[in-house]
């Protein structure tokens, strides 16, 4: 629509109500169809009145030759009309692509795996961010000024941070213990995998709360900013790296099955220190990876990145580096380790 034009637009050929740009000109549906049919038939048209006929909504059918000429004068382009053969080829390709998308479906085993992951995630992780408000947040964290729901004074930001992070790790541990494939591993391997992946799984889950517009984490009635992390004691350079990771991942607009499969891939990493059953854990990670790949392929490609799976693998590798840096940060924030013995054990 032209700037400053609020009313309905008129067809450049006959003056009827225009429905949009067709073949490079603003026209109504009638003139669009007329132009397509006339050009496709490729019949010679001649005006009996030397091209002087008036073309408007009432008289547009009286002289096809003058109507066609007015279409061309308005800017409609013949070369934008596909031939019948080209149109048939395009429709065939579209049908083929739809068939390919439909063919890429999860196997029964993969469907059951996804349902198991989603169930455990819903029970222990899905609602944990709404519960942060229970840990006596400082008043400035509330998105809207409101009273605390409990008659206790707020905690200092550092203590609140320690409590919500301990709570997140506890919920992630419950999530993993709810997975039969994880419980089937030896206890020493369960501990090694959890020590390596707990923080990574927390951040994969936390990404669902990240707001791209404000670069904040929105957890129920609370809002956490980069500045809050600085006040806790994290280095700003590390926080910028962390927030860039979250922004990149959030832009992919992942669905919940994709998030939980990413988390499962992080969990079943055979190269974690202390792992003994490397081959079995490698097999489990491959199972998660193939399921994620199949799930992505089975989704319609509209608004999806063609290389989404490869980019998610890259982000998992980046998250590993962030995890290592996070452990270093935790160790060097004065007083924080003593408040978070569980996280201290995870990061050691």
UniProtKB/Swiss-Prot annotation:
Single GO BP term: cell differentiation
Zn-finger segments (NR C4-type): 11-31, 47-71
InterPro entries, per the entry: NHR-like_dom_sf (IPR035500), Nucl_hrmn_rcpt_lig-bd (IPR000536), Nuclear_hormone_rcpt_NR1 (IPR050234), Nuclear_hrmn_rcpt (IPR001723), ThyrH_rcpt (IPR001728), Znf_hrmn_rcpt (IPR001628), Znf_NHR/GATA (IPR013088)
Gene3D superfamilies hit by this protein: Erythroid Transcription Factor GATA-1, subunit A (3.30.50.10), Retinoid X Receptor (1.10.565.10)
GO molecular function, one term: zinc ion binding
Residue positions where Phosphothreonine is found in the record: 38
Compartments where located: Nucleus; Cytoplasm; Cytoplasm, Cytoskeleton
GO cellular component, one term: nucleus
Its job: Binds and transactivates the retinoic acid response elements that control expression of the retinoic acid receptor beta 2 and alcohol dehydrogenase 3 genes. Transactivates both the phenobarbital responsive element module of the human CYP2B6 gene and the CYP3A4 xenobiotic response element.
Domain notes from UniProt: Composed by a short N-terminal domain followed by the DNA binding, hinge, and ligand binding/dimerization domains.
Protein name, UniProt field: Nuclear receptor subfamily 1 group I member 3
UniProt organism field: Pusa sibirica (Baikal seal)
């Amino acid at each position: 629509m032209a700037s400053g034009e609020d009313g309905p637009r008129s067809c450049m050929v006959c003056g009827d109500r225009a429905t949009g740009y067709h073949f490079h000109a603003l026209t109504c549906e009638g003139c669009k169809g007329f132009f397509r049919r006339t050009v496709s038939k490729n019949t010679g048209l001649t005006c009996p009145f030397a091209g002087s006929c008036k073309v408007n909504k009432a008289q547009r059918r009286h002289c096809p030759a003058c109507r066609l000429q007015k279409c061309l004068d308005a800017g409609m382009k013949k070369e934008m009309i596909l031939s019948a053969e080209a149109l048939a080829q395009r429709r065939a390709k579209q049908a083929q692509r739809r068939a390919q998308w439909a063919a890429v479906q999860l196997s029964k085993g993969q469907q059951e795996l996804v349902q198991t992951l989603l169930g455990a995630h819903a029970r222990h992780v899905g609602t944990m961010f709404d519960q942060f408000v229970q840990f006596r947040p400082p008043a400035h964290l509330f998105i809207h000024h409101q009273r605390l729901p409990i008659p206790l004074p707020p905690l200092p930001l550092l203590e609140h941070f320690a409590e919500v992070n301990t709570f997140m790790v506890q919920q992630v541990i419950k999530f993993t213990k709810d997975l039969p494939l994880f419980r089937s591993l030896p206890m020493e391997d369960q501990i090694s995998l959890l020590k390596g992946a707990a923080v990574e799984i927390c951040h994969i889950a936390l990404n669902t709360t990240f707001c791209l517009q404000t670069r904040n984490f929105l957890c129920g009635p609370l809002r956490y900013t980069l500045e809050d992390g600085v006040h806790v004691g994290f280095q700003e350079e590390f926080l910028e790296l962390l927030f860039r990771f979250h922004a990149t991942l959030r832009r992919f607009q992942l669905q919940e099955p994709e998030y939980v499969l990413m988390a499962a891939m992080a969990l079943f990493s055979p190269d974690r220190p202390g792992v003994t059953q490397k081959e079995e854990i490698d097999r489990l990670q491959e199972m998660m990876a193939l399921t994620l790949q199949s799930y992505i392929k089975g989704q319609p490609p509209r608004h999806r990145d063609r290389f989404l799976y490869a980019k998610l693998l890259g982000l998992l590798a980046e998250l590993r580096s962030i995890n290592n840096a996070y452990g270093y940060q935790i160790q060097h924030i004065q007083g924080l380790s003593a408040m978070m013995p569980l996280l201290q054990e995870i990061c050691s």
